[in-house]
Structures are given as C-alpha cells and as structure tokens.
Amino acid sequence: MSRKESRMQAFQTLFQLEMKDTELTINEAINFIKDDEPELDFDFIHWLVTGVKDHEPVLDDTIKPHLKDWSLQRLLKTDRIILRMATFELLHSDTPPKVIINEAVELAKQFSDDEHYKFINGVLSNIK
C-alpha cells in the first residue's frame, strides 16, 4: 500500500491520540488498525506517529513563526496535526518537500474545512 494511505492512517491515529478521554498508547492505537488494514506500512506509520508525538514542542516552535496572525492553539485540531506531521517529515526524511506538502494538502482537503488546504500549503511552503 502507498505512503499516501499510510500517512492518512498516521493522521487518523494522531487524531485519536489527541482525544482528551483516551489513554491509548501509540502502539495500542496502531494495533487497532492492523487487523483492518494489514497491507499498510506500519513501520512508516509508527515512525511518523512516534516522531510527531516525541518532537511536538520542537515542531510547534518550527511552525509558529509561519502562522501569521494565528496561534497554534486557535487552529483546528486537524490542521495542527497535519502541520506537525508534514513538518516532522520535512525535517526528518529524504522525501522531497514537494511530495510532503502535496500529501499534507490532500489530507487537509479530505479532513479539514473547505479552504484550509491553502493555509496548510502556505505555512509548509515557508517551512521547507
């Protein structure tokens, strides 16, 4: 299965972990999907989810200067997660920035409000 589907599952896992009432660990959250989606790249999903959670303060500090009149806390949870995921990949992978940004834009089109993909694209274009 492609990285696109694995990124989507990483996003959904991070969203689930952000829920206030959850006590799930990263491994538990990922294990929930293994039965339903055995063809996904679980090494990549684990790397991305763990990386985002472990580096959250650094990722937030990297994102904040590019928000222009917004605070990270005011962003939709979906946008915050997408920005963190893409920023982590930009900083810690060999994947071309254009691919990472495009995948983030596609996630925003699917999971965020109508025009938020433009905001995501603008912020990430300044980070790369």
UniProtKB/Swiss-Prot annotation:
UniProt record similarity statement: Belongs to the NusB family.
Keyword Cell membrane tagged: no
Keywords carried by this UniProt record: RNA-binding, Transcription, Transcription antitermination, Transcription regulation
InterPro entries: NusB-like_sf (IPR035926), NusB_fam (IPR011605), NusB_RsmB_TIM44 (IPR006027)
HAMAP family listed in its UniProt record: NusB
Cellular component aspect of the GO annotation: cytosol
Protein name per the record: Transcription antitermination protein NusB
GO-annotated biological processes: DNA-templated transcription termination; transcription antitermination
Role played: Involved in transcription antitermination. Required for transcription of ribosomal RNA (rRNA) genes. Binds specifically to the boxA antiterminator sequence of the ribosomal RNA (rrn) operons.
Gene name tied to this protein: nusB
Cystines in this chain: none
Keyword Transcription tagged: yes
